[in-house]
Curated annotation (Swiss-Prot):
Provenance organism: Rattus norvegicus
Keyword annotations: Acetylation, Adaptive immunity, Cytoplasm, DNA damage, DNA repair, Hydrolase, Immunity, Phosphoprotein, Protease, Thiol protease, Ubl conjugation pathway
Gene symbol of the encoding locus: Otub1
Residue(s) at site: Required for proximal ubiquitin-binding: 23
PANTHER family: UBIQUITIN THIOESTERASE OTUB1, UBIQUITIN THIOLESTERASE PROTEIN OTUB
Name used for this protein in its record: Ubiquitin thioesterase OTUB1
Amino acid sequence: MAAEEPQQQKQEPLGSDSEGVNCLAYDEAIMAQQDRIQQEIAVQNPLVSERLELSVLYKEYAEDDNIYQQKIKDLHKKYSYIRKTRPDGNCFYRAFGFSHLEALLDDSKELQRFKAVSAKSKEDLVSQGFTEFTIEDFHNTFMDLIEQVEKQTSVADLLASFNDQSTSDYLVVYLRLLTSGYLQRESKFFEHFIEGGRTVKEFCQQEVEPMCKESDHIHIIALAQALSVSIQVEYMDRGEGGTTNPHVFPEGSEPKVYLLYRPGHYDILYK
């Protein structure tokens, strides 16, 4: 009997370690599965797609899905084409960035205004307390893309830049920083729209600056105001009525960027 006691004493920590290993293996399995899903999404969806006929949307829903089929039909009265973005949580910023820069290829006056505002934006962020060393590379990439447009690059080359993961993600990071900066500058106004007892700064650190965090009204308003670029979003969901619900940010302005929103995702629209 005495010989068995050490074995019993050893079994307890072994069981504990085993559970720890199992938990770790489970966590790793989940992470591996998430990586596989992201890889599949990446293979199937470019960061920004070619321009497509809007009618491709019909095929994304069942023929007897009357709500969406009717809303697509309504959308077709106002728009002819769509350019899709990868559903990775960064789609709003990527869609905004490509849509506006593409439009600037044919609008030299707006290009010069936008370039001046964008050039000064780094200085504004630094004055707010953002570290220049931290944001400099992201700002440089942003300005490089604007200068690419200024040199009258082709839409195909601009699209290639946006589908380069590093370039595209650096642009997204900088647009997130601009959004955060504006929200914090205007914190007295925006604090009333933030739930959970968080400060505007906490909200920005948790919901705006990190990559892959989805965007809502508050993000759109802030970026539109920060760069003085009006955005019209067509909201398409399962709500009643056979029409999409357009919303212009800021209200009453003349839209320069047109986006389609379906729950959790933004794509680019063309008239």
